[in-house]
Design a protein with these regions (language model features):
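Short coil/turn segments at secondary-structure boundaries
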Residues: 32-35, 83, 101-108
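N-terminal basic, low-complexity leaders that serve as flexible interaction/assembly modules and, when applicable
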Residues: 1-76, 112-127, 147-153, 192-203
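Glycine- and acidic
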Residues: 23-30, 100, 141-144, 177-180
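A gly/proline- and charged-residue-enriched helix-loop-helix capping module
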Residues: 88-107
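Active-site-proximal glycine-rich helix-loop-beta segment
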Residues: 52, 169, 275
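Single conserved hydrophobic/aromatic residue that forms the stacking wall/gate
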Residues: 271-280
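Active-site loop segments of alpha/beta catalytic cores
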Residues: 112-115, 119-129, 134-270
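A charged helix-plus-loop insertion that forms the helical arch/lid used to bind
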Residues: 77-78, 82-85
Length: 280
């Protein structure tokens, strides 16, 4: 039998953050914000347990954005002077921070929510992190001058946090990589390698979630161009099957990925998410 779990993020209540916005703002600040994040996390843990899920997540209630929630705790990134950049192969424009110096973690990134979740559930705990390829597609490079080099730098930082999360008692660490459904050649060439750097040394279960993005017009129009069969994974799946990543989560409800392509993932335990994930 397959264990049951959410893909990752869950809606934030209106008393925590703005609703139905791509880049929502927090509705409070300071100690009140920290308490609101904790309250929302605990409410969703209870909801998941009440639903009978086998694996529990924090619902990403303490993060404004699935990428920025990590990179905000990285030195060498300028969030003040954001620039407009096309992301996901120029599918749409976004205001993104700039990498301007060597990348280093300021300290722990997700200790608060991981330890909170671990203390409030006896079930298996999953925690999500953005994948290195998706991070470099969501920030502007003004320092490294090489996308792969910057991805590997982020992968090292992700690895530091992933090992710390494992020490916090996390059972499954999932890396979110929507870039894997956009840059097929690059994902097979170096994206999976960067992912393995991020997962290096982990003894807990490792997973990658390949999501199709927010339900915004730009994403919906892009999906319409993919035809009646989405075979773009023929390049990426074999690379993932050969990797050390143990699980693949793929959003299938609104996709047209032929089921026979799952054979290309032999060696991985495949999960198919029932609905689009809240990531771009």
């Amino acid at each position: 039998m397959f264990t049951t779990a959410i893909a990752g993020s869950l809606p934030k209540p209106a008393w925590l953050a703005e609703t139905e916005k791509l880049w929502p703002q927090w509705t409070t600040q300071g100690p009140e914000l920290q308490q609101a994040k904790a309250d929302a996390t605990l409410l969703w843990i209870k909801a998941q347990e009440d639903a009978g899920l086998d694996v529990i997540g924090d619902g990403e209630q303490a993060r404004q954005h699935f990428v920025h929630g990590f990179v905000e705790q990285v030195e060498g990134i300028d969030f003040v002077n954001k620039v407009t950049m096309g992301i996901r192969n120029n599918r749409y424009d976004a205001q993104v921070p700039q990498v301007i110096a060597p990348l280093r973690l300021k300290g722990r990134v997700h200790a608060f929510e991981a330890q909170l979740a671990r203390a409030h559930t006896k079930k298996k705990l999953k925690f999500t992190l953005p994948g290195p390829m998706t991070i470099v597609d969501t920030v502007a490079d003004r320092f490294y001058g090489d996308k792969v080099k910057m991805a590997m730098a982020f992968a090292e930082l992700l690895n530091q946090e992933a090992l710390a999360l494992q020490a916090d008692g996390v059972d499954i660490i999932q890396f979110d990589e929507p870039a894997f459904n956009v840059y097929m050649d690059e994902a097979a060439d170096w994206g999976v390698k960067a992912l393995e750097v991020a997962a290096r040394g982990l003894t807990c279960i490792t997973a990658v979630h390949i999501c199709y993005g927010y339900g915004i017009e730009a994403n919906n129009k892009w999906k319409e161009t993919l035809g009646h069969e989405w075979r773009q994974y023929e390049k990426v799946f074999p690379a993932l099957a050969k990797s050390s990543i143990q699980q693949v989560s793929l959003e299938c409800m609104h996709s047209h990925v032929p089921m026979e392509m799952m054979k290309l993932l032999e060696g991985c335990l495949l999960y198919t998410s029932p609905s689009p994930r809240d990531c771009s």
